[in-house]
Amino acid sequence: MALLSFERKYRVPGGTLIGGSLFDFWVGPFYVGFFGVTTIFFATLGFLLILWGAAMQGTWNPQLISIFPPPVENGLNVAALDKGGLWQVITVCATGAFCSWALREVEICRKLGIGFHIPVAFSMAIFAYLTLVVIRPMMMGSWGYAFPYGIWTHLDWVSNTGYTYGNFHYNPFHMLGISLFFTTAWALAMHGALVLSAANPVKGKTMRTPDHEDTYFRDLMGYSVGTLGIHRLGLLLALNAVFWSACCMLVSGTIYFDLWSDWWYWWVNMPFWADMAGGING
């Protein structure tokens, strides 16, 4: 890929966290760095271990390949490779690759002298992953409660985990997370549509300005968050969507153990209508 004209002045030494100048170089448009090397190492090793697991399983169908965690009765012990140990090693590789990628993002931010918003945002995704495969299983006392690495099997795990607690649709944290995901998609669609409409005015008109964009939303809903504000809002919505989605799993089986539909009886038994004749309680 060609080096863009403005990029060369930003390719300066320094800003590394580990390794000094040893890996402080670029390959084409890609910055390497120490954590780029560790990302490649962990990702490659994890991928090869998945292939090994597929060979042990006896299938090369991507939809059927599945690496299962150790059985629940194994607890938090290290398992044999063919009894879930392979899943444990792949989890270490995935965690190492994700964290290395985030730290590589930190080094790039340091080189450019910009804020750490991108690695912070990516770290929220890492937190969600670790919640499912490390934090929640450790709180429940067994790696067997983590999800398997497979297309269909991980979907089965999602379904089974949801129905273990009655119906996850009644999980208030699940409600909040899903609502925020929908809101994030809505905000992104509105923002993207607004920018494209300003950049592609009707024939004969010049490109519109941010003032036009602000005025549109003030006319539409009485307020415009602004060109910078919409990106702050989008980041806030997206981070909260991931955080509360992780929380909906984290509290299930660790803090709350019953059916999520039963959790809502506090609403049914509120004094406003609990004893009302013909009311919600009959």
Curated annotation (Swiss-Prot):
Binding site for Fe cation: H191, H231
Subcellular location, principal: membrane
Database matches in InterPro entries: Photo_II_D1/D2_sf, Photo_RC_L, Photo_RC_L/M, Photo_RC_L/M_CS
GO MF annotation list: bacteriochlorophyll binding; electron transporter, transferring electrons within the cyclic electron transport pathway of photosynthesis activity; metal ion binding
GO biological process, any: photosynthetic electron transport in photosystem II
Entries under Gene3D superfamilies matching the protein: Photosystem II protein D1-like
Keywords: Bacteriochlorophyll, Chlorophyll, Chromophore, Electron transport, Iron, Magnesium, Membrane, Metal-binding, Photosynthesis, Reaction center, Transmembrane, Transmembrane helix, Transport
Positions contributing to (7R,8Z)-bacteriochlorophyll b binding: H154, H174
NCBIfam families in the record: pufL
Protein's name in the database: Reaction center protein L chain
This protein's encoding gene: pufL
